[in-house]
Structures are given as structure tokens and as C-alpha cells.
């Protein structure tokens, strides 16, 4: 069974600082055409940083699209499509929390919204942490703190953590440690 679509035309209709929006015409498997709107994004990283006492570094920050403060794992965007995700993860952990790590484990890639964006989020676990100084971007305001991993698993079960990348990062890291 053929399920693939083929791009026939493509035009950029918005070119922003973080995203580009394009409108494509696609040939469908049944021979008809359809319009596809695609948000292009460089991608991002998410870090489940665990202390020696199995606490997770967590951040609180205001998320403008939702109009509220959310709790998340440290995360950020790739500066370019070809940036090494591990290097971006190290940078984001350092910027947002001040911490660096000696041990990094790749936990996988997450496609947050497969229907209309090509964004990928690379998820890492960081261990053997060393505390340093936060270096937030000038337009970034957040607070970081430590939370026991067991309580985060309960928070996910009870719908207290709505962010998908954070849920996935916590659950993948917890699985490695038998939680």
C-alpha cells in the first residue's frame, strides 16, 4: 500500500527568527492534490539532569503561547539545523541552570507535532553534575530547582506536567534507574 505524498510546489509565506512557514502542494497516493502548511524549525534539545541523590534539575518559566508559568526540564533550540544536539544540550543546561555534567546519555528523539512541523527534540540525560553560574539569554527569565524523580513521576501520572518533552525525558531517565 502506497502511503507517501510527493511535494509538487513549495512557497515560503513567513520567515521569522525561530520558525519558517511554507505552503506546499502535495500529490496524494490517490492522485489528488492537497495543500500542506509546514512549520520549519531547527529543532531543540531537552536535558534530564539528575543529581547524585536522584533529584532532577527543573525549571519554571512563563510560556507566552499558553499565558502561564510551566515547569519543564532544561531545554532550548538548536542554533542552526546542523548544530550537534549534544553540544546544544550542554549549552542549554549550563545557560539555564549553571550546571555542567561529566556523563551524557542520549535518550532518543521526539517529534512533538508530526502533522505540521519538522521540529525534532533530542533528549539527553546528564549525570555527574558540577554546579556553576547561570548564563540566561537576555530575553530569558526562569527559576531552576531540584525535584526528586519519584515525585515527578507522580506529577506526570496526575497531569501536573503538561509538557510532552519533559514527560518523555523524565520517564526515559526514570526507566534507566528502575523507577
Where are the predicted features?
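Charged phosphate-binding loop/patch that engages nucleotide di/tri-phosphates or the phosphate backbone
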Residues: 166-179
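Short loop segments at secondary-structure junctions
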Residues: 29-30, 51-53, 62, 126-131, ...
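Short glycine/serine/proline-enriched coil/turn segments at secondary-structure junctions
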Residues: 16, 65, 113-116
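Residue-level detector of beta-propeller blades
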Residues: 7-8, 106
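Hydrophobic residues on conserved beta-strands that form the core of alpha/beta folds
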Residues: 21-23, 35, 59, 73, ...
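Conserved Nudix-box catalytic region and its N-terminal flanking loop in Nudix hydrolases
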Residues: 2, 46, 51-91
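Unchanged
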Residues: 34, 43-46, 77-164
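Acidic, metal-coordinating catalytic segment for phosphate/diphosphate chemistry
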Residues: 11-46, 51-52
Amino acid at each position: 500500500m502506497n502511503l507517501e505524498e510527493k511535494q509538487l510546489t513549495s512557497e515560503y509565506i513567513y520567515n521569522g527568527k525561530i520558525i519558517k512557514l511554507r505552503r506546499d502542494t502535495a500529490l496524494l497516493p490517490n492522485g489528488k492534490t492537497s495543500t500542506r502548511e509546514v512549520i520549519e524549525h531547527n529543532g531543540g534539545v531537552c536535558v534530564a539532569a539528575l543529581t547524585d541523590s536522584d533529584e532532577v534539575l527543573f525549571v519554571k518559566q512563563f510560556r507566552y503561547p499558553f499565558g502561564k508559568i510551566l515547569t519543564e526540564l532544561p531545554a532550548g533550540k538548536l542554533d542552526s539545523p546542523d548544530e550537534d544536539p549534544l553540544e546544544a544540550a550542554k549549552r542549554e543546561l549550563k545557560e539555564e541552570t549553571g550546571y555542567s555534567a561529566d556523563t551524557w546519555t542520549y535518550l532518543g528523539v521526539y517529534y512533538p507535532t508530526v502533522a505540521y512541523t519538522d521540529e525534532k527534540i533530542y533528549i539527553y540525560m546528564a549525570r555527574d553534575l558540577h554546579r556553576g553560574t547561570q548564563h540566561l539569554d537576555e530575553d530569558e527569565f526562569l527559576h531552576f530547582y531540584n525535584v526528586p524523580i519519584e515525585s515527578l513521576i507522580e506529577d506526570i501520572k496526575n497531569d501536573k506536567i503538561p509538557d510532552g518533552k519533559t514527560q518523555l525525558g523524565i520517564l526515559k531517565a526514570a526507566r534507566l534507574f528502575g523507577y
